[in-house]
């Protein structure tokens, strides 16, 4: 055992197997170290939070802070990213990626409160989360030391972790039968490992937690009305709700209809490909609602720019660069465009699908008089010829040059 000069460490604690083992490990390997557990409530399973403080104390923590960050998560992290339309590699709605900087910030706040000189996370050396946590801490609290047990200890399996806790009489609900690795918050739940480790294996039914199988969803479609103000969802079916409240309602409706499932192989930041089943029912509905309003109010160049902002934002958030200037710049760009993104969308949910079937906005650029396929008195078809000639001028010049050769 060594002292390492660390007197008090704040641990990102979940109550799961890994972080339950980290508490006694810290006390055994950092002599005289005081461990403060910090649980950040971002909408994970309520059962996981029951008794979590007592569990942390029984594992050896001197204190346990439970931070309710549910509204903050959706309002200050999810909504700004949603405005950009960010989808990592075209499909992932960044549920885990958006949560990590918030958790990291909450730990820094607790560290300042208790006078800690170190921070600790339970992310493995193979994953993205270690980068996200430590990049955030480098930006927010560069003076604090960082402890990453998975890069130090020799406990390399669930069996080893269970034996470690058993030898110290520390109770845990974990077992060898729980073969999946899951991450859950208000926005999504992810499932990895087990049968999913082979991309040739189809997911089992137990790979999905929130959503019903679309084949078993109701045979009748359901319509839901979503109200958007300046790029933020503010009401569902006419009822004004908080950001977290809107998501709660849409999660329930979407899950019932099997909405928001994806099964993907993604490129991790650390160079490994990983496979996961992700469920984001409410988020999928919100994304469809925002895109529906955008189609009405954004001109062609603005829409194209928003798509570029979303693509870049997906990588910035996924890579753990939340507190970097680029993320702030991208968010500012999206918020500027979102000033016009207000309206109402009716979406139809049916067996896993979300379809915007009605949309309106006072800022709409859609004009029926111009768009009609019938006879109109506002559009002179002869004007199109000059536009096309100028638009295709470079192609015409290139072709003429080729004829001269």
From Swiss-Prot:
It comes from the Bacteria. Pathway: Amino-acid biosynthesis; L-arginine biosynthesis; L-arginine from L-ornithine and carbamoyl phosphate: step 2/3. The keyword Nucleotide-binding applies. InterPro entries: Arginosuc_syn_C, Arginosuc_syn_N, Arginosuc_synth, Arginosuc_synth_CS, Arginosuc_synth_type_1_subfam, AS_cat/multimer_dom_body, Rossmann-like_a/b/a_fold. Belongs to the argininosuccinate synthase family. Type 1 subfamily. One of its GO terms (molecular function) is argininosuccinate synthase activity. L-citrulline binds at residues 92, 97, 128, 132, 181, 190, 266, 278. GO terms for biological process: argininosuccinate metabolic process; L-arginine biosynthetic process; urea cycle. The keyword Transferase does not apply. It is found in: Cytoplasm. Its EC number is 6.3.4.5. PANTHER family: ARGININOSUCCINATE SYNTHASE. It is an enzyme of class 6 (ligase). It catalyses: L-citrulline + L-aspartate + ATP = 2-(N(omega)-L-arginino)succinate + AMP + diphosphate + H(+). Homotetramer. GO terms for cellular component: cytoplasm. SUPFAM superfamilies: Adenine nucleotide alpha hydrolases-like, Argininosuccinate synthetase, C-terminal domain. This is Argininosuccinate synthase. ATP binds at residues 12-20, 122. It comes from Cronobacter sakazakii (strain ATCC BAA-894). L-aspartate binds at residues 124, 128-129. Keywords: Amino-acid biosynthesis, Arginine biosynthesis, ATP-binding, Cytoplasm, Ligase, Nucleotide-binding.
């Amino acid at each position: 055992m060594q002292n390492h000069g660390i007197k008090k460490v704040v641990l990102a604690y979940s109550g799961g197997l890994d972080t339950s083992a980290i508490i006694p490990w810290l006390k055994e390997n950092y002599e005289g170290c005081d461990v403060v557990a910090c649980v950040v409530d971002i909408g994970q399973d309520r059962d996981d939070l029951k008794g979590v403080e007592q569990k942390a104390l029984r594992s050896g923590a001197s204190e346990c802070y439970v931070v309710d960050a549910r509204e903050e998560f959706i309002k200050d992290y999810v909504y700004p990213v949603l405005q950009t339309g960010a989808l990592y590699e075209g499909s992932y709605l960044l549920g885990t990626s958006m949560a990590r900087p918030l958790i990291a910030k909450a730990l820094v706040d607790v560290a300042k409160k208790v006078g800690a000189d170190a921070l600790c996370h339970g992310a493995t050396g193979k994953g993205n989360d270690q980068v996200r946590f430590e990049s955030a801490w480098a930006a927010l609290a560069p003076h604090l030391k960082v402890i990453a047990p998975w890069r130090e200890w020799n406990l390399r399996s669930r069996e080893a972790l269970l034996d470690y806790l058993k030898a110290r009489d520390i109770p845990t609900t974990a077992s060898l039968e729980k073969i999946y690795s899951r991450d859950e918050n208000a926005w999504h739940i992810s499932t990895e490992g087990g049968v999913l480790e082979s991309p040739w294996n189809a997911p089992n039914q137990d790979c999905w937690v929130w959503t019903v199988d679309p084949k078993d969803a109701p045979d009748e479609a359901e319509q839901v009305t979503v109200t958007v103000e300046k790029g933020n969802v503010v009401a569902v079916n006419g009822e004004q709700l908080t950001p977290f409240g809107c998501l709660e309602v849409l999660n329930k409706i979407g899950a019932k209809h099997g909405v928001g499932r994806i099964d993907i192989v993604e490129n991790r930041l650390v160079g490994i490909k990983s496979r996961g089943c992700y469920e984001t029912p409410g988020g999928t509905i919100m994304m469809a609602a925002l895109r529906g309003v955008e189609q009405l109010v954004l001109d062609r160049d603005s829409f194209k720019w928003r798509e570029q902002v979303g693509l870049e934002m997906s990588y910035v958030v996924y890579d753990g660069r939340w507190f970097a200037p680029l993320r702030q710049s991208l968010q500012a760009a999206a918020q500027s465009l979102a000033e016009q993104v207000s309206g109402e969308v009716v979406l139809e949910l049916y067996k896993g699908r979300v379809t915007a079937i009605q949309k309106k906005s006072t800022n709409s650029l859609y004009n029926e008089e111009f768009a009609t396929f019938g006879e109109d008195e506002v559009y002179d078809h002869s004007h199109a010829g000059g536009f096309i000639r100028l638009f295709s001028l470079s192609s015409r010049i290139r072709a003429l040059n080729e004829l001269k050769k």
